[in-house]
Structure formats: C-alpha cells, structure tokens
C-alpha cells in the first residue's frame, strides 16, 4: 500500500535551564485504530467525607440542623476538635472509633508536658501534640509534632503534621496496652526529647521546616483514650468540665436556660430555649467557620417550633452578634410541632456571619430542623458552577459512607427537611436532607451520568421505592455495596456479599431490566480462588467489578496498568465470553497536588489502552472544604470555604482530558523515552488527532512526532499543566497551577514542560484517501468503524485497520 505521511516536529520545554536531551520520537499511525474509548472515563467520586455534601455541595447553611450533636462540653482552658471529650472524677476521656484532639489555648516556645494515658477501645494511636498551630476539625488538620503510643503494634510513634501526616519514627517499645502509662515530652522549639514511663526513648530535631512554638494538646486517632494527671512545666493542670445544655454546633445568646431535649420532630434530639426576649442560640455553619452572608442574595428558611413563647426572632448577624444584617419575627407557636418559614434579605455582606434564633417574648420554645438556604437550594451555586466547568461525564455517589448501618434508602425519600438523620461513618450526626436522589438530580443538572451505591443490607422494596422517586432522572447505574470485605479475605464474608448482591439484584432487575449493576467485592489478586468464585456467581448479573487502585503518584499509576491487564486476563480465562468489565470508581490517594494530577492523567492513558475494558473512571474525591481532612483523605479536586471556591491541579487535569476527548485510540509508539507516557486518540471523521502526554520527570525529552495517514495539518493547540510535584492552589493563590493554552505555528517545534500533563490537539484540513490498495488487502468489501458491512462506498474515505478496509 502506498502511504502518505504528514510529519510534525515536537520538542519539549524545560522548567528552568535547558538540559541536553537525546533524540526521542513518537510515531503515530492515524489509520491504525487500536480500540475505542468510552466517553464516561472523565468522572469524579463523591461521598460525605470531609463534609463534601453536608456543609459543602448541599446548600444548607446551618450545620447541626437537627441538634443531634451532644451538648457542648467546655473543658476549661482547652478547645476540642472533631469528637466530644468528657471529664469524670478528674479523668479526661474521648470515646471514638475515629479521631479527636483537645488543644490547650496557651502558646509555648519551650517547656515540658507530662500526662498519664490509658489506651481504650478500638485501635487508638494516642498521646501528646506540641507546637500546635492552625488547628481545625479533621484528623490531620493542624500543624505540630505528635508523640504517641500505638495500641495495636506496641510501638512508639513520632511524627509531624502539616495539615497532613509525616511519619518520622515508629518503633517497638515497652508499655502497657491495658494499664496507665506516663508520656512526657521536653521541647525547645523543634527539638523534642520523649519519655515513656520515665525512660527516655527518643530525641528529635526538625531542622528542615521547624515549628518553633505553638500550643500543646491531647490526641487520639482510631480509638478511645483517657488522660489524667496532666502537668505543664511540672505544675498540675486540672481537667474541669462545664456543660452549657446546648447542642454542640450551636452557641448560647443572652442569659437563658438551655436544655438539649432527647426527642425531636425528626431524629433523637431538639433544643429548648427558655428565658426572656433576646435569649437564644447562634449557628456559625460548618466547623463554626462562619456563614457567608451576601447582600445580593436572598436567604430563605424553615424551622420547626413548639412551646409557650408567643413569638421568636430569626436573624443574620456578624459572628459575634455586634452587627445585624436582616431579621424577621415568627409568631403563632403552639404546643405541637409546626413548621415556620422565613425570608431574609441582608443589608450588608459578611463572609463569616451567623444565624440566630432567639426569643421575642417570655417563655420557652423547642426548636428542630432549622434550614437556611439560598435560591439555588438544594445545591450551592458556586460549587455547582465549578462542577459544570470541569466538563465531567460521570459522577459516582458512594464510598465508605454507604457501609454505615443506618445508611438506608427508606430515609432518603420524601420531603427533605422531614427525613430522619442517620449515624454516618465519617460524621456521626449525618443528614439525609441531601441524599442519593438529590445527587442524581445534581448529576443530571450539570450534564453527567450518575451512579449511586447502596448498602448491601438495604431492603429491596425500600430501594425500589427510592428508585421510583428517581425515575425522572433516568438512573442507569447502581452499585451494590462499597469495598466489601476490604478488611477480611475470609471466604464466608465474600459468600455473604454474593448472597446479598443476588437478593438486591433479583428484586431490582425485575423492575428495572435495563439497569447496569456494579458489584463491590474487594478485588484481591492474591486470592484468586475466591475471586473466581465471586466472578462465576455474579457473571451475567454484574456488568462491572469495582476496582479501587492507589494512585497518589504517576509511578503508582504506571503500575496499575498491569493490574488492569491481569484482571482482564482472569475474566477471560474464567469465561471467554464474559461481558463483565472493570469500573474504577475510586482512584485514591492522600493528596491533591501536581503529582496527583499527573497520576490521574497517567491513569487515563491506562484506561484508554484498555480498549473498553475500563469504561468508567472516577478519582476521589470530587470536592473538599479547605483545611478539612478526615482520616487522611486530603484529595479533593474542588476546594471551598464558606465564601469561595477554587480548584486543584487534579481538577484541571480532568478538565483538560474531558474537553479534548476523542473516541478512537490509534497506534502510537515511543522511542528512547523515560518518565514519559503518551496515548494518541482520533476523531471518527479523522480530522482531529489528540496526544495526551504525561512527563513525570524533572527534565525534558525532545519529542519528534512521526505522523502517518493524517491529512494536511491546519492547526495545533497545546494545553499544558505543570509545576512542582507538591504544587497546589490556595485561597491566596487560587490559580497558581492552571492549564496554559497556546496556539502553535504549524511546522514549528512544540514544547512539552517538565513534570507536566500536556495535550496537543492537531487538526487537519482534509482526510487522506486510500485510492490504491496492495495485495495485502484482497477483500473488496468495506466496513464502517463499528464493523458493519457497507455496500455503497460512493464518495467514501477509505482507511485500513487490521488488514480490512473501513470507510468514513
């Protein structure tokens, strides 16, 4: 066959001084189609971890809407984070399976802290934290050094927190896992000397990025712990507790009497306010950060009330109540629960404002289910717009939140404000005001394909009732469970999952035969006998097997390609005719920086090369509040505060890929390259070629592109995202790392930055025809790209693929 070639030279741009580079090339045959690429690989995964939903996407400005949080416990001199701390007989305790810290509100540059500690239930890693700065809610949301004991391993642990976890030392030492131990640290700036039960066991000096002063605190991660006999510089500090009678996300206003009532309109609690005019409660939104009040925005609300007071007053105020922006009185309160609505138009803006509910006459009221929202309810407008601009094609609502016992579909339908709250995995006092139906509605609103996950113990009829409510949004994908048996390889656990999958599948499939099902049994490449059992049991029922790789760096993403190939190989070995494929519903990591962006870009190349075996891909997590970090999941793509939204490098990597999607993978071959990964894709009409290049090296490689069977090049566009591996965007510099788009003169050298994801879009003015064919192609029949025989080839453009003639 005669071939016509169009050649373009590509070179790379260095970050900093240029380095000598050997000749490197990529050869692309635009006519040799290697596979098809699903349009649904540009996804994102969301669940209510880090308050992505409640406090984030959900346009409910009140946090603690139903007063489910226990009453606030004040411990003199300390400020608590995450969980509730309590004091009994001088012993301070935290009862949790998650994490919490208690920070003493005095700054020290040097000193000595000593405490006796008893490790409790669960798997606690507990102890002291020093040089604490910038503390907030979230497991790693602070700066400081940690000195701790690990109950499970019997190890001493020393590490640094910088809104993340940086392990420094972890070694076995002698202490009791069932009795009191004495932990002490002597510190001078970033120098620390650590003692366990009076024995010096470790010294550390941080000279790289030292923290020279800060507060100290007590912390437990992964389980419960108790503390007593605290000494600061040898002087006892007593744990003294007072209770205000107010649910933990609210503050008292005035001098009223407050009681958290153990019943409510919904849920298990409500809030009583008793006193005179002006006595009330104040809410500051998520994490007490403040509610954004915009004078150009109308605010609407609902509150359920009962009581003896004739009327109450609702208001938008400054954080401390010194300024008021809008107010409205509510009357007609009776002894039975009744919903009251209100509208507030603020006279001024305040990015850290508050909402107040107070008595406007003597008596008492009991309040429950307080809603404050804007016209965009139930979706926060600025976050919605950021989602829309990312050009996602797929959204998954699922994750560990699904595994919570109370995560049940029966509580997710009906009027939002009347739904029952539930005990969540990531946040104990979770709301169903935003649940799976709202997420499906949201996905359709921004033009993406939704998938949701359900609890494997859910009732089939309840799930069907929820799906019925979702019918206007045409949900097509349903996952049963999430990461099932992640913590056990036991065969009976997998058998139970298979049993529950079938129960739910059979009921749902009968009513929704076109629904696609995803199963969530945890894939274990080292337990193939069990994997084969699951495969045979669910083959023909489950359309996809959910796979969650760890992809924090490009190097880790590179290794995943073999995992995908091995998975596909096993599927075909177990059943050559299987239609089950792989869905990557979570690419996971602990970061949201440039390294994570390049890792995702590399993963997309892996997925493209899978030739449709992986038609769905969604990195976690879709969004995250600034300085909110639960359990290390510091991996949001969209970041937000109460008043602003900005995007991280992985967001832009996904946006670049989605904007330049083409459906056909064409042959590409790299020569003499390291730390660079490339795929080439093409439009169906053959007029657009897209190159996705991931350069995860710190130096450049000069690329020469050898392009065959493509028309005359009309234009070239380059999109490039680059920066240091740890580069991320902040509220102060929200666009520090964003894609740069340039038009490149045809025929000139193109430049690929070091440590970058770069997309080249090459357009042709026409498509090369194949008027002469050699004996290599004896068949005169022609086909379309889907493999269908075409009889009329008049005015057709012929291409060659796998020794057969195809036309466009």
Annotate the PLM regions.
Residues 96-160:
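Secretory/extracellular carbohydrate-interaction modules
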Residues 48-49, 583-681:
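Aromatic/acidic polysaccharide-binding cleft in carbohydrate-active enzymes
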Residues 22, 765-808:
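C-terminal outer-membrane/trafficking sorting elements
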Residues 83-100, 111, 155-159, 259-280:
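Short carbohydrate-recognition loop motifs
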Residues 162-182, 328:
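Short, aromatic/His-centered strand-loop micro-motif at the edge of beta-sheets
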Residues 675-712, 718, 755-759:
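Carbohydrate-binding surface patches
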Residues 204-226:
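Flexible glycan-contacting loops in extracellular carbohydrate-active proteins
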Residues 353-357, 361-364, 469, 492-604, ...:
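Noncatalytic carbohydrate-binding groove/subsite architecture in carbohydrate-active enzymes
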């Amino acid at each position: 066959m005669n071939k016509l070639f169009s050649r373009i030279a590509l070179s790379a741009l260095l970050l900093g001084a240029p380095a000598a580079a050997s000749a490197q090339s990529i050869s692309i045959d635009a006519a040799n189609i290697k596979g098809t690429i699903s349009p649904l690989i540009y996804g994102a995964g969301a669940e209510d971890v880090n308050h992505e939903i409640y406090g984030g996407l959900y346009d409910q400005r009140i946090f603690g809407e139903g007063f489910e949080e226990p009453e606030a416990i004040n411990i003199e001199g300390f400020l608590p984070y995450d969980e509730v701390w309590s004091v009994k007989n001088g012993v301070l305790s935290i009862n949790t399976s998650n994490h919490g810290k208690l920070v003493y509100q005095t700054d020290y540059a040097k000193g000595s802290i000593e405490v006796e500690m008893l490790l409790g239930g669960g798997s606690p890693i507990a102890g002291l934290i020093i040089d604490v700065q910038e503390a907030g809610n979230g497991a790693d949301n602070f700066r400081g050094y940690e000195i701790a004991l690990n109950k499970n391993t019997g190890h001493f642990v020393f590490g640094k927190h910088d809104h993340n976890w940086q392990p420094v030392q972890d070694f076995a030492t002698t202490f009791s896992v069932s009795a009191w131990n004495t932990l002490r640290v002597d510190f001078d700036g970033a120098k620390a000397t650590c003692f366990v039960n009076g024995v010096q066991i470790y010294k550390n000096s941080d000279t790289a990025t030292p923290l020279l002063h800060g507060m100290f605190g007590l912390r437990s991660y992964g389980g419960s712990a108790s503390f007593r006999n605290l000494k600061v510089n040898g002087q006892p500090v007593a744990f003294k507790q007072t209770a205000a009678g107010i649910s933990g996300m609210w503050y008292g206003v005035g001098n009223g009497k407050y009681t958290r009532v153990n019943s409510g309109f919904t849920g298990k609690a409500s809030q009583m306010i008793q006193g005179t005019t002006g006595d009330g409660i104040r809410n500051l939104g998520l994490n007490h950060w403040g509610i954004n009040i915009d004078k150009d925005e109308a605010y609407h609300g609902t509150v359920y009330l009962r009581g003896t007071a004739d009327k109450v007053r609702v208001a938008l105020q400054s954080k401390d109540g010194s300024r008021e922006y809008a107010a409205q009185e509510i009357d007609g309160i009776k002894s039975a629960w009744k919903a009251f609505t209100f509208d507030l138009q603020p006279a001024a803006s305040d990015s850290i404002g508050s909402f107040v509910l107070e008595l406007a006459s003597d008596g008492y009221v009991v309040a429950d289910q307080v809603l404050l929202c804007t016209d965009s309810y139930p979706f926060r407008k600025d976050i919605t717009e950021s989602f829309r601009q990312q050009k996602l094609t797929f959204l998954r609502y699922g994750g560990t939140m699904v595994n919570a016992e109370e995560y049940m579909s029966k509580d997710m339908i009906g009027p939002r404000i009347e739904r029952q709250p539930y005990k969540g995995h990531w946040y104990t006092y979770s709301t169903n005001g935003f649940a799976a139906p709202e997420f499906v509605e949201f996905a359709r609103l921004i033009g993406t394909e939704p998938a949701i996950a359900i609890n494997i113990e859910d009732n089939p009829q309840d799930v069907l009732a929820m799906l019925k409510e979702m019918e206007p949004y045409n949900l097509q994908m349903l996952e049963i469970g999430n990461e099932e048996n992640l913590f056990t390889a036991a065969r009976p656990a997998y058998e139970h999952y298979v049993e529950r999958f079938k129960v739910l599948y059979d009921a749902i499939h009968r009513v929704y035969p076109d629904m696609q099902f995803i199963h969530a049994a945890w894939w274990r490449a080292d337990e193939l006998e069990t994997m084969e059992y699951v495969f045979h049991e669910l083959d023909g029922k489950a359309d996809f097997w959910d796979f969650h790789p760890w992809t924090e760096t490009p190097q880790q993403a590179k290794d995943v390609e073999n995992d995908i190939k091995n998975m596909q190989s096993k599927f075909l070995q177990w059943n050559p005719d299987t239609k089950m494929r792989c869905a990557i519903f979570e690419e996971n990591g602990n970061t949201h920086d440039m390294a994570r962006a390049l890792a995702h870009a590399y993963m997309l190349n892996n997925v493209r090369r899978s030739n449709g075996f992986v038609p769905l891909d969604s990195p976690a997590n879709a969004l995250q509040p600034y300085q909110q970090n639960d359990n290390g999941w510091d991996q949001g793509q969209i970041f937000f505060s109460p008043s602003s939204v900005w995007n991280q490098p992985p967001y832009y990597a996904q946006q670049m890929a989605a904007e330049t999607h083409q459906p056909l993978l064409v042959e590409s071959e790299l020569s003499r390259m390291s730390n660079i990964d490339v795929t080439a894709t093409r439009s169906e009409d053959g007029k657009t070629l897209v190159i996705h290049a991931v350069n995860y090296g710190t130096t450049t490689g000069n690329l020469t592109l050898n392009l065959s069977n493509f028309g005359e090049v009309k234009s070239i566009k380059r999109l490039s995202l680059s920066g240091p591996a740890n580069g991320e965007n902040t509220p102060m510099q929200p666009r520090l790392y964003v894609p740069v788009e340039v038009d490149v003169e045809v025929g000139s050298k193109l430049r690929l930055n070091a440590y970058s994801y770069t997309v080249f879009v090459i357009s042709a003015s026409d498509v090369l025809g194949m008027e002469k064919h050699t004996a290599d192609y004896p068949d005169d029949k022609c086909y379309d790209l889907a493999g269908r025989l075409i009889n009329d080839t008049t005015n057709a453009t012929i291409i060659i693929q796998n020794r057969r003639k195809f036309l466009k």
